[in-house]
Amino acid sequence: MKWILVLALVCLAVEYSYSWKVSERCLKGHGKFQADQEIGNGLATAKGQCKGTDSDQKKAGKCDKHCTGVCLGSGGSCGDGSSQKPNKEDCYCKSK
């Protein structure tokens, strides 16, 4: 019975620690950007995260992989010049 209680407490501590870190990242912004919620297309925008990416990197999908990391796994991609993702230097994160 003690082991179940200890396991439950460890799981709660890990979950609390993870949620605290995620909340802290959201409040402070991650590195160089502050995520802004775009109302028109429903995508959160991470400004300037695709700066300096060349066409070879975009072809290899490296930019989109980078954006998925920036978007904390919710899925994301770099702008493509369309009306939904106009700025090619920004990451656009999918809403959860």
UniProtKB/Swiss-Prot annotation:
Cellular compartment(s): Secreted
Purpose of the protein: Salivary protein that inhibits host voltage-gated sodium channel Nav1.5/SCN5A.
Protein species of origin: Xenopsylla cheopis (Oriental rat flea)
Keyword NADP: no
Mutagenesis / variant outcome for changing K47A: No significant effect on inhibition of host Nav1.5/SCN5A activity
Protein name: Salivary protein FS50
Broad class of the protein's primary localization: secreted
Native organism taxonomy: Eukaryota, Metazoa, Ecdysozoa, Arthropoda, Hexapoda
Result when mutating T53A: No significant effect on inhibition of host Nav1.5/SCN5A activity
